[in-house]
């Protein structure tokens, strides 16, 4: 466990982004994760649209991701429905991949297929490199987990990460 620049590893933006993708792929039940990644990288889905989705989800007793799956039926969503559908379809593709790949391979697919890596390349070189190193480290943690746990599923890996992140938070609060 290492503290880099005073920020807990699991509190780093790029790690939180990829964790949010993994949680959304795993179940889609975490509305915060869905909200975090719907525009990472940018997809042009605005706050007004997200608010309409959230209201629809609330009124119909469903999760945000479930509302997104029905976006074209929601009044006032308009052209944004296509962008939302693109996001939903991408998550569905990742869900299918998650059945065949371990988390490290899935992370690689997310980074490449979403354009996340391309976005990183637009940053200042040292910032981009630091973020890439953190993502590599996270992939290594995922690979290690799967190497040490036969029959591990994405849910198991996410539970492990949550546990480690909680312990890291307690450690950093104790300092």
State what each model feature region is.
Residues 5-9:
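Short, acidic/turn-prone active-site loops that include or flank metal/cofactor-
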Residues 2, 12, 19-175:
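Conserved helicase C-terminal RecA-like lobe
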């Amino acid at each position: 466990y290492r503290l880099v620049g005073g920020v807990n590893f699991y509190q780093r933006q790029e790690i939180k982004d990829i964790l949010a993708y993994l949680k959304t792929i795993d179940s889609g039940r975490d509305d915060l994760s869905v909200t975090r990644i719907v525009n990472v990288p940018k997809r042009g889905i605005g706050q007004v649209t997200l608010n309409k989705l959230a209201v629809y989800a609330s009124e119909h007793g469903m999760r945000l991701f479930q509302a997104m799956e029905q976006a074209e039926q929601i009044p006032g969503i308009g052209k944004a429905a296509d962008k939302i559908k693109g996001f939903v379809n991408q998550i569905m593709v990742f869900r299918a991949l998650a059945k065949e790949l371990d988390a490290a391979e899935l992370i690689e697919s997310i980074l490449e297929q979403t354009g996340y890596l391309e976005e990183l390349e637009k940053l200042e070189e040292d910032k981009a490199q630091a973020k890439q190193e953190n993502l590599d480290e996270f992939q290594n943690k995922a690979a290690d987990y799967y190497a040490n746990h036969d029959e591990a599923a994405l849910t198991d890996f996410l539970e492990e990460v949550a546990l480690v992140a909680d312990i890291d938070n307690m450690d950093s609060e104790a300092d």
